């Protein structure tokens, strides 16, 4: 992915997340601000920040590895989105008590701003990034090549990964030099 696309994507994630929380707050008012909901803020569970960090690291690692494996397996590529969605649904149920289930720094930051809740914010930046980078490295060591890393292959949109999947190209996309 070109640096400009990555930068724009990151900024858009944070701005979009914040806009979504603020719009929801405008529509739901006191219900979203209620202490029991507190803007859906993501905070470590009662087991603490270490457990929350490990939970976020593990879920991010497994999700990224699953996306890389399915999206780079020709027969499974069309199921990449389903695999990612199913894993995320399972994570919401199983992992939420430990970290609140984020896997996305923009999601956590966007809720933290109106809630003014910053406890453990660092781990929601460090753990998902570390887990996904580690998954990428494990994939490269295990399979050697990455052809594509996107969730949805069957569309006519520009591919920011330049993988050539939409053109039938079989050249690998290199994740790490």
Feature-to-residue mapping (PLM):
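Membrane-interface helix-loop junctions and terminal tails of multi-pass membrane proteins
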Residues: 1-177
């Amino acid at each position: 992915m070109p640096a400009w696309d990555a930068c724009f994507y990151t900024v858009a994630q944070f701005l979009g997340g914040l806009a979504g929380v603020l719009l929801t707050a405008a529509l739901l008012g006191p219900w979203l601000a209620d202490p029991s909901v507190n803007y859906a803020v993501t905070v470590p569970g009662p087991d603490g920040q270490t457990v929350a960090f490990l939970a976020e690291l593990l879920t991010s690692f497994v999700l990224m590895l699953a996306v890389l494996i399915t999206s780079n397996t020709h027969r499974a590529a069309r199921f990449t989105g389903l695999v990612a969605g199913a894993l995320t649904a399972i994570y919401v149920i199983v992992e939420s008590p430990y970290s609140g289930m984020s896997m996305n720094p923009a999601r956590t930051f966007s809720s933290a701003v109106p809630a003014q809740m910053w406890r453990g914010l660092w781990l929601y930046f460090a753990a998902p990034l570390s887990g996904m980078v580690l998954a990428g490295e494990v994939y490269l060591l295990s399979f050697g090549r990455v052809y594509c890393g996107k969730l949805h292959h069957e569309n006519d949109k520009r591919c920011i990964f330049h993988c050539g999947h939409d053109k039938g190209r079989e050249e690998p996309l290199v994740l790490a030099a």
